[in-house]
Amino acid sequence: MITVVYFWQIKKVFLPIAILFMAFHKFALMRLPGVSFVKLLGTGKGESFTPKDANPYRWGALITIKETHLDNLDDSKVIRGWNKIAKQEYRAILKPVSVHGLWSGKQPFDVEKLDWNGKIAAITRARIVWRKNVVFWKAVPPVTISLHQSHGLINAIGIGEAPIGLQGTFSLWESASHLREFAYKGQAHTQAIKATEENKWYSEELFSRF
C-alpha cells in the first residue's frame, strides 16, 4: 500500500464546483479498486489553525491505495475533475516509514521497514476537544513560527477536514534528522507537547513520516 497526496490551487471562478467536489468525492474515491482510506482536505497557511487561516482556493486529498491501482486513481473522474479546475497541481507518492496514533479511529497507513536517508514528508493531525479550541489557538503561534523557521524545512502547509476542530500539517524536510531536530529539540514544539499532555487538547491524534 502507498499513500498519495494531491493538492490543487483552483481558479477562483470554480470555487462553487470545488465545494461540491468536497461534498461528494469521498464516496466516489472509496469505491475505486484498491482504495482503503480517503480524506478530502482543506488547506491553510499553517500559521494559526483558526478559520481565518484557511485558503478557499487550495484543496487536497489523501488516499491510501494499492500501488498497482495508482494509474487507475490518477485516471479516475475525481482526479481528472480536480485537475480540470486547477491552475496548479501537486502530487506526492508516499511510503510510510512510521506512524503513531489514529485517524478517525483507524491506523490508515501501511508502514514499511525502509532504509531511507533521503527527504522526508510528515503528516500530523488531531481532533481537538471542542471546548478547548480557543486555548489551543492561543498556544499555536510560537510553534508555527518555529516550524516555518526550521532548518531543513522545504515547505509546510496546514491541512484539515473542517475549519474548526480537525487540524493538521503536511510538511517536507531535507532529512529525518531535520524533522527530529524540530520535533524533539525545538523549544516551542517541546513546550507544546508538554502543554498537550497537561491540557489534554486532543481527543485523537496522529503523527506519521513518509
Each PLM stretch: what is its role?
Residues 76-78, 186, 196:
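Alpha-helix boundary/capping residues
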Residues 1-58, 67-73, 84-168, 177-185, ...:
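Short S/T/G/P-rich N-terminal loop/turn motif that feeds into the first structured element of a domain
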Residues 181, 188-204:
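Extended hydrophobic/aromatic segments used for targeting, binding, or gating
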